């Protein structure tokens, strides 16, 4: 893919270079920047799968591509590591609002990376690019988690990343998800219980009609 460096104004190039340098020396928790000195518009990072999620233990390579209209237009995000996730297509394209309708020119690369990391903790099935993953997340969380864990074990194994970021809005949230007891798992368990109760009630009414 061709570089967009020559298409960006000098002050934007300096701005991006400064932010990437800062992120490299002071990265958010669980995120490691892989700087490309030849093309700063190709920002590659490793993201550590958050604890308590089906992605825990995995290291996921992804990249942001800064187009010629950046920062007026959002960057494009792609996972280079295969991942089973509702908001990531089979070719790695990431669907998240901050890369689309919620983008603002003043939002930086750090904000985008933290948002994508949060997406690993809180998937959004309503804007699914992977329809199968979105359907399983809503209808059968255990199967969704099993598929996601398997993909992580096959494609995303690596050494853990170190680093703490007190501004990371996801760091405390991930701790509540351990062992499938987090809000996502509980929500889907509650939905299943309601469906089972409704089915039993319907079956009972049908049985009474036959008497």
Curated annotation (Swiss-Prot):
Residues of the active site: 95
Gene3D superfamilies: Ubiquitin Conjugating Enzyme (3.10.110.10)
Family: Belongs to the ubiquitin-conjugating enzyme family.
Biased composition range(s): Basic residues: 197-211
UniProt entry keywords in alphabetical sequence: ATP-binding, Cell cycle, Cell division, Nucleotide-binding, Transferase, Ubl conjugation pathway
Annotated pathway: Protein modification; protein ubiquitination
Enzyme Commission code(s) on record: 2.3.2.23
SUPFAM superfamilies: UBC-like (SSF54495)
Residue ranges, annotated region (Disordered): 157-211
Name this protein carries in UniProt: Ubiquitin-conjugating enzyme E2 S
SMART domains the UniProt entry points to: UBCc (SM00212)
Catalytic activity: S-ubiquitinyl-[E1 ubiquitin-activating enzyme]-L-cysteine + [E2 ubiquitin-conjugating enzyme]-L-cysteine = [E1 ubiquitin-activating enzyme]-L-cysteine + S-ubiquitinyl-[E2 ubiquitin-conjugating enzyme]-L-cysteine
Coiled-coil regions listed: none
GO function terms (MF aspect): ATP binding; ubiquitin conjugating enzyme activity
Top class in the EC scheme: transferase
Function per UniProt: Catalyzes the covalent attachment of ubiquitin to other proteins. Acts as an essential factor of the anaphase promoting complex/cyclosome (APC/C), a cell cycle-regulated ubiquitin ligase that controls progression through mitosis. Acts by specifically elongating 'Lys-11'-linked polyubiquitin chains initiated by the E2 enzyme ube2c/ubch10 on APC/C substrates, enhancing the degradation of APC/C substrates by the proteasome and promoting mitotic exit.
Domain UBC core: 11-157
Example GO biological process: cell division
Gene from which the chain derives: ube2s
């Amino acid at each position: 893919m061709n570089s967009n460096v020559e298409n960006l104004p000098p002050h934007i190039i300096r701005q991006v270079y400064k932010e990437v340098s800062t992120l490299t020396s002071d990265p958010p928790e669980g995120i490691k920047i892989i700087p490309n000195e030849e093309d700063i518009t190709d920002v590659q990072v490793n993201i550590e799968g958050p604890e308590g999620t089906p992605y825990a233990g995995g290291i996921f390579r992804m990249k942001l591509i800064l187009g010629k209209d950046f920062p007026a237009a959002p960057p494009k995000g792609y996972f280079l590591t295969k991942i089973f996730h509702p908001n990531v297509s089979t070719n790695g394209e990431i669907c998240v609002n901050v890369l689309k309708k919620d983008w603002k020119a003043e939002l930086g690369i750090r904000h985008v990376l933290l948002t994508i990391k949060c997406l690993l903790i809180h998937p959004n099935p309503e804007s699914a690019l992977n329809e199968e993953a979105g359907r399983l997340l809503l209808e059968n969380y255990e199967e969704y988690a099993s598929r996601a864990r398997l993909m992580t074990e096959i494609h995303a194994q690596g050494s853990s990343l170190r680093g703490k970021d007190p501004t990371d809005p996801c760091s405390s949230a991930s701790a509540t998800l351990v062992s499938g007891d987090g809000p996502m798992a509980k929500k889907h368990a509650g939905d299943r219980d309601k469906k089972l109760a409704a089915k039993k009630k319907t079956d009972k009414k049908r049985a009474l009609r036959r008497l």
